[in-house]
Amino acid sequence: MSDEDDVDDVDAEQDEVESDKEIEEWEDYRKETEEASEEWLPTPITEAMMKEGLSLLCKIGSGLAHAYIKLEAKDRDLTDISLLRSYIHLRYVDISENHITDISPLNSLTHLLWLKADGNQLRSARMNELPYLQIASFSYNQIIDTEGIFHPRLGSLDLKGNRIHQVTGLDPERLSSLHTLELRGNQLESTKGIYLPKLKNLYLAQNLLKKVEGLENLSNLTTLHLRDNQIETLNGFSQEMKSLQYLNLRSNMISDLAELAKLRDLPKLRALVLLDNPCADETDYRQEALVQMAHLERLDKEFYEDDDRAEAEEIRQRLKEEQDQDLDPDQDMEPYLPPV
């Protein structure tokens, strides 16, 4: 494994630790804002606020005119962004940590590339198709579904910390560029509805999932986070998931080590996390994982050594010999003697 691969694994775990801390902080923030919601006063964004938040002067159109293309209007207690309809040249918009319930004014921003609307009171991320939007973040709102999201160049979509029960409306034809989907910390009861062929990174931790289903054909998926769910079995994985390298199943309910055999068809899986599952308390836990998945390089936080691999290979060979004997029809058969 290359040094770059090592760094990728460390980055994945570090991102997870930081995200866990972020979720806790946002949950505290959400409780505070919900308690204070009755005290919110209507606060529309004003020209003065726009003047303060605008930056990045660029040429527009034929290059003879100029306009500011970046707006930061974060944490201003905003409830209304209607004024943005007239700022059609904006490409980068941050309206996080406000009290916004309606983002329809953003439909006019047809040049928008980057949108951050975290920590508001949105119940939907629905917008008109924005042809150039590449990154959109709606984390820690009150969003209840995934309908109305169809931007052809959207590569990263963050919906963590919302109230989504089911994934619907994510059309692979209209989200053909989506490579990263963040749904951590919702109320998902199923992984169905996520057939997005270009998807590389999928974050489903801290939901209510009991099984994996509907992900079998995600052939480009490299990272799958399923931590802190209620998964008991490892059904739902297939050899079509030929790019999957990192699988995090920490803090689920997997008790039977035999379930690990269902991961053998993942040809590129090299890092698996199963900490805080009942099966991780078994005596032969690490050995059994390597016996089932010869290509595995790391289990939880520890890498396998050469001695571990040699021992696992011996066990595999012994099991194969025993299986071959069981299948041999001539083994231990009494010789046939014709009657006298």
Curated annotation (Swiss-Prot):
Domain LRRCT: 277-315
Stretches the record annotates as Interaction with RSPH9: 205-340
Subcellular location per the Swiss-Prot or TrEMBL entry: Cytoplasm, Cytoskeleton, Flagellum axoneme; Cytoplasm
Gene null: resulting phenotype: Mice show male infertility due to impaired sperm motility but do not show compromised respiratory ciliary motility. Disrupted assembly of radial spokes seen in the sperm flagella.
GO terms (BP aspect): flagellated sperm motility; radial spoke assembly
Residue stretches spanning the membrane: none
LRR repeats: 89-110, 111-134, 177-197, 198-219, 220-241, 243-264
Pfam families linked: LRR_6, LRR_9
Keyword Cytoplasm: yes
PROSITE patterns cross-referenced by the UniProt entry: LRR
Annotated stretches, region: Disordered: 1-38, 317-340
Function: Essential for sperm motility and male fertility. Plays an important role in the proper assembly of the third radial spoke (RS3) head and the bridge structure between RS2 and RS3 in the sperm flagella.
Self-association state and partner proteins as the record states: Component of the axonemal radial spoke complex. Interacts with RSPH3A and RSPH3B. Interacts with RSPH9.
Protein name stated in the entry: Leucine-rich repeat-containing protein 23
Organism lineage: Eukaryota, Metazoa, Chordata, Craniata, Vertebrata
Name of the coding gene: Lrrc23
